[in-house]
Design a protein with these regions (language model features):
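Long helical/loop segments within the catalytic core of UDP-sugar-dependent glycosyltransferases
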Residues: 31, 108-129, 133-135, 139, ...
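Acidic donor-binding segment of Leloir-type glycosyltransferases
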Residues: 73-119
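A short, conserved beta-strand element in the Rossmann-like catalytic core
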Residues: 92-94, 121, 148-151, 178
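Short beta-strand-to-loop acidic/aromatic patch adjacent to the donor-nucleotide binding site
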Residues: 139-150
């Protein structure tokens, strides 16, 4: 049996690689463990939440997403929350979104919708839609989500609002992917989870750097 031997250079490279691996593993362990510790503290009642439920404006920017609006918007409109409005900014006029939103407004008086002008071609239409939603809002606290997202329950808005305090500037949430079959779906779901854990971990460490609109 032939034994493997390493010269000095190889030993140094091997030691350096092992050290970097350990540092990287400890880095991710400390970062992601913050999420676990936070979740455990919430379950044990060790986290203070606001008892007030301030009025909230929910803003949804939708670009020709009639099917998503049909599937998810009612779940947002029917949240168990004392005072809130839902503002949908419709970007595009090639589907039935406008007709559907107009119909829903007759049933839900707290729903309001507007549109992005077709002449707006040289700026980010998503940013413009969000700006229009903010300008149309009546309340100080703003909640952003997307037409493709569906709340897990009618308590979604309450769970967000309990974090609204005088010391809070931004509340970050997590939006997962529905379970599905296939390697590609699992890869997308994993990437989404990994990204979310990273920005939530940094936020809990006091260094927030990003969030997503879902």
């Amino acid at each position: 049996m032939e034994a493997f031997t390493f010269d000095t250079t190889e030993q140094i490279l091997l030691a350096a690689t092992g050290t970097l691996f350990i540092i990287q593993a400890l880095y991710y362990l400390c970062l992601y463990n913050r999420i676990h510790l936070r979740s455990r503290a919430v379950k044990r009642g060790n986290v203070h939440f606001s008892q007030e439920l301030p009025p909230v404006s929910v803003i949804i920017c939708a670009r020709e997403e009639c099917e998503n609006l049909r599937r998810n918007l009612k779940a947002v409109l029917e949240q168990d929350y004392p005072q809130f409005e839902v503002i949908v900014i419709n970007d595009g006029n090639t589907d039935e979104s406008e007709d559907y939103l107009t119909l829903l407004e007759e049933k839900y008086p707290h729903l309001y919708h507007s549109f992005v002008p077709d002449s707006s071609r040289y700026i980010s239409r998503k940013k413009l839609a969000a700006t229009l939603g903010v300008k149309a809002s009546k309340y100080d606290w703003l909640v952003f989500t997307e037409a493709s997202c569906c709340p897990q329950s009618n308590q979604w808005l309450r769970l967000l609002a309990r974090n609204f305090t005088s010391r809070t500037q931004v509340v970050l949430g997590y939006s997962g992917y529905e379970r599905g079959k296939g390697w590609l779906h699992k890869r997308v779901a994993f990437d989404n989870l990994f990204t979310s854990m990273r920005y939530l971990g940094f936020a809990l460490a006091g260094s927030p750097y990003m969030g997503i609109g879902r």
